[in-house]
Regions:
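Polytopic membrane enzymes that build or remodel cell-surface glycoconjugates and lipids
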Residues: 1-225, 240, 247, 261, ...
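C-terminal luminal/periplasmic domains and tails of membrane-associated envelope-modifying transferases
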Residues: 172-182, 186-417
């Protein structure tokens, strides 16, 4: 197509990578040996390109032997010709960095690959004088190939499900208009497994490509929403599967500013083998000091105006703390859950908004909605949620209705399962 007059110029971008590109498609030709090659690479650190080339040489020798023995030259050469015709345009036109993340291009040569391996399996089976034994060997070889395909598809499906869950959460979060503009933090755009079924094929799933953004994803699914994504590494956990996140990387000051210009803040987290998107709160700036008495007053620096708790659809407790700040506070927030016997059964300490807006960064007039989550609790009900602030000198005084709280831990809400 590129050579047709008036259509476009032909760019041979892949010529500089022709060795790697050819080896990539040779890997496709010998793909049933891919799991074995990958195991050798992982266990002994051999070079995958070299192993693919060695495997191709072995397959070629076996193929020639079987073709000579069975007089199948026409079918063998037809399969190889189809493979070459399907692979050659990509070999000369695309860089290796593109091929490596695009195993779908192997489908261009798939008819030739299947033809070659059908002849190889049939040829090996025909070496046995016992017809039933030959059929059993043929079925075993074909079944091994199908099994490796199933493993590959299973891993791809696992990656897709892991990302699909968090994107379903995203669409649910974006559905109500009152949530926008939305701030989405650490949203994984792509997921790749560090383990490989086939040596030279990267197993990955991409939900938002580099040329798009979270707002466009929402728009094509439910309609336009004002949404923006960012990356904040201090609350980004490392996982076995490597993922890329949407948005620009921000520091502490940047993430606070990012939160203040959006109505709701949502944080993507990895928890118990899955990614989830949680609403973690909001920050309003330059608000007036409330005239009503605070639920909890921590010596004038910060106060809790209200607190509530309810069960989320996923079974976790969703604890909401509404703070008002008179200025930055030298300290950290603790949130403890105690049972009827005053035993500690859970804690969700740390900065507000999922760990992104610490109390020492609060400014006068900030109204912070701090949403935290905790799973199932064990112990005697009811459970009490206690909140306090501490620093190197100890806990800050906590006052409720003019009375200082025992241990400076204010019981703000009760949980009953």
């Amino acid at each position: 197509r590129s050579c047709l007059p008036g259509i476009g110029g032909m760019r041979l971008t892949g010529l500089k990578d022709w060795v790697q590109n050819t080896t990539f498609f040779v890997h496709g030709l010998v793909y049933p040996l891919g799991p074995l090659i990958g195991e050798i690479v992982e266990r002994w650190g051999w070079q995958d390109l070299t192993l693919v080339q060695m495997s191709a040489a072995v397959v070629l020798v076996v193929g020639v032997f079987l073709a000579v023995r069975g007089r199948e030259w026409r079918w063998v050469t037809a399969g190889l010709w189809w493979w070459l015709c399907g692979a050659l345009p990509s070999i000369v036109a695309l860089p290796f960095s593109y091929l490596y993340i695009s195993p779908r291009l192997l489908m261009l040569a798939s008819v030739g690959i299947v033809t070659v391996w059908a002849l190889l399996v049939d040829g090996v089976a025909s070496l046995f004088q016992d017809v039933r034994l030959g059929r059993a060997v043929g079925l075993f070889l074909a079944g091994s190939i199908v099994l490796s395909n199933g493993v590959f598809l299973g891993r791809q499906r696992g990656l897709f499900i892991a990302l699909n869950d968090v994107y379903q959460d995203l669409l649910l979060a974006a559905a109500p208009r009152e949530h926008e503009p939305l701030a989405i933090v650490n949203l994984p755009t792509a997921l790749a497994s560090q383990r490989k079924t086939y040596a030279m094929i990267l197993e990955n799933v991409i939900f938002i490509p580099w040329y798009s953004n979270v707002s466009e994803f929402i728009e094509v699914n439910i309609g336009y929403r004002d949404a923006e994504a960012a990356i904040f590494t201090p609350v980004r956990a490392e996982t076995e599967d490597v993922f890329g996140a949407a948005g620009e990387g921000l520091n502490w000051e940047g993430i606070r500013s990012f939160a203040t210009i959006h109505r709701t803040v949502w944080l993507a987290r990895y928890d118990a083998g899955r990614y989830r998107l949680d609403e973690v709160g909001s920050v309003l700036t330059a608000t007036q000091q409330p005239v009503n008495d605070a639920l909890v007053d921590f010596g004038g620096g910060a106060r809790i105006e209200a607190a509530a708790a309810l069960r989320s659809d996923d079974g976790r407790w969703r604890i909401v703390l509404d703070w008002w700040a008179a200025g930055p506070v030298d300290g950290e927030i603790f949130v403890h859950v105690r049972d009827r016997n005053d035993m500690l059964v859970g804690q969700i300490d740390g900065p507000a908004l999922g760990g992104m807006v610490p109390i020492w960064m609060w400014e006068r007039g900030d109204r912070i909605r701090d949403i935290r989550y905790i799973g199932d609790l064990e112990g005697d009900q009811p459970f009490r949620v206690q909140v306090g602030i501490y620093n190197e000198s100890g806990r800050l005084p906590a006052w409720m209705s003019g009375i200082r709280c025992p241990d400076d831990a204010a019981s703000v809400v009760v949980l009953e399962q």
